Amino acid sequence: MASVLHSTLEAVENERNKLDTLFLHMSDGVVAYDGSGKLIHCNPAACELLGRTADECVYSELFESICPFSHVITMQRSDYVEGELTVGERSVELYFAPFSDEESGGVLIVLHDVTEQRKTEERRKEFVANVSHELRTPLTNVRSYAETIREAGDDLSRETENDFLDVVISETDRMTHIVQDLLTLSRLDSGRSEMNMARFPFSAAIDSVLRSTELEARRHKHELTHDYTENLPLIMGDRGRIEQVMLNVLSNAVKYTPDGGHIRVTAGSEGETVWMEVADDGIGIPEADRSRIFERFYRVDKARSRESGGTGLGLSIATEIVQRHHGSLTLVDRPGPGTTVRLELPITQPIGGEDSHE
């Protein structure tokens, strides 16, 4: 009998140790109170989520207003109540349940951090709102000008009619660009946009992009200069995508620098990394906007961006492409006016990374 009792106690102790280890290391918080509301368990995750020590986790202070203790303690064991608590900038989802139907039972609360989930939901809502806004404006213009042409009939001069049709074409082009950019982002987000990886000369890609922007730079009376050697390393990457990134950065400098400005392109290599910087002497980016310029649809100068046909998606697409290449696209802090954007890329790609699509 003694040996059986000893084995039983040992088994119970082992099970308790397993549970203690589980509660100790689980990412969700767990708090338990006895039937009188006294704390009997609080794991480290709960303390971290609540920003309190175990002794400070008083039910009446933390949870009573969300779900009264008297209500939870009288619920059936299979029932539970959901709630949510905000702790600083953190959103915590709560699940209340009794852990016994007996009077001597208590209340168990599971805490789950949903901060990132809530942020994702907000970004999704903002994204949908932005898409709706960006498409609504050109659609309204197209409808307005089309109705004017139809209603005016022969009273509209050929020159005016052509001007109106030019607006319609321009706005449909703008909607097409938005849809194309959205599809590109969707493919990048889902990983369905494969990179055609191959070795190519980094300097040759810069040369190609400079040739593509020379005419537009001259139209704005900009001085476009460059400083880099032709013997920069060959890099592994999708040349078309990398040139798309370079073109976006350089085109932004050309578009948003007041006419008659100076735009300078420099490039080089450091260890296993190549880099390119595009610096302009425009008005620069306000400090409050610097952390957001790579966000989708975010534009510092919305009016000018729309005038130039910008969708507000270019830099976010560029960032996605660069990240797929294990590189970085950043703003460089520098004194004085103007903006400097730096692109950094590894010369080789990690084994099993994007070069697996080569």
Model-inferred region functions:
Residues 55-116:
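PAS-family sensory/regulatory modules and their coupling/dimerization elements
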Residues 170-175:
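Short alpha-helical segment of the dimerization/phosphotransfer core of two-component systems
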Residues 190-195, 234-237:
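Conserved micro-motifs of the catalytic ATP-binding
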Residues 196-200, 218, 223-233:
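Conserved catalytic submotifs in the C-terminal HATPase_c
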Residues 202, 284-295:
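Short helix N-cap motif at coil->helix boundaries in the Bergerat
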Residues 260-272:
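Short beta-strand/loop element within the Bergerat-fold HATPase_c
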Residues 327-328:
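Conserved glycine-rich
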